[in-house]
Amino acid sequence: MRNTRTTITLSAATVLAAGTAVLMPGVAQARPSAVACNETALVVAVTAANAAGGGTVTLTPGCTYTLTASHGNDGVNGPAGLPVITAPITLEGNANTITRAGTASAFRIAQVGTTGGLTLKAVTLSGGHAAASGHNNGGGILNFGAVTLTGSHLSGNTADGLGGALSSTGTASAATLTSSTVKNNTAQQGAGIASVNGTLTLTSSVVNANAATVNPGGIYYAAGSATLNTSTVTANTPTNCTASPSPVPGCIG
């Protein structure tokens, strides 16, 4: 236990020295100042949280973090703007946006590994583009672990494969959206969300105005479980959920 605490404390000190702020699990700390409003500070903070086994990264209120390059690649699934999430990490936002620069090469915003968890609170992810040959799912987020959105938004992301905003894949994968929106994303199929063999739960959330080349445009669901609680899937093209490999309970059109 003593060694674990030492490692986390040193990681926290490293992060603070870099001008960023991370709350590490299991260590008593005063709430730190927010991560500086720039790409480097955000990448350093996420890297430190991964190394510490998880943590909360507090973002500068109202800041748009613009990613100009990929900072994550597991060598299999193509590039991601943020370091691959390998531990439970919360991005604590306040009207924040994390976006790919329009002049940057194609990469999704985030990838969550099987051991990882990404929680977004009041954060928008936009501009991600999954285009790697054969690994082009999840323009906003590619998830193999756990993704939780609370009061957050996925918009303007593109996947050349499945899941323009979010692709969640594998029996261990879980995607939970509460009071969140998935809008104006594009993909080959499932321009809003693609969930394959995992658990998908939407509560008081909206999947709207997403456009796919092939049905369905809103939610692509294949096995696992899907639950819509007081949520709407509307105005997606060509369809909302029709032609999904498995029916999406409560989704019409």
Mark where each language-model region is.
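Extracellular beta-strand-rich solenoid/capping regions of secreted or surface-exposed proteins
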Residues: T47, T68-T90, T99-K121, H129-G145, ...
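Secretory targeting and sorting signals
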Residues: M1-A30
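Extracellular/surface-exposed low-complexity segments
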Residues: A12, G19-T20, G26, L228-G253
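The right-handed parallel beta-helix/beta-solenoid scaffold, focusing on the short coil/turn
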Residues: G55, C63, A80, A87-I89, ...
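Right-handed parallel beta-helix
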Residues: N94-T97, T119-H129, T148-T158, A174-T186, ...
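Extracellular beta-strand/beta-solenoid scaffold signature
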Residues: V76-A80, T103-Q111, S133-L142, A159-T169, ...
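Glycine-rich repeat segments that build the extracellular carbohydrate-interaction surface of secreted
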Residues: S33-A36, N50-H71, P88-N94
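Extracellular beta-strand solenoids
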Residues: L59, L67, V84, G93, ...
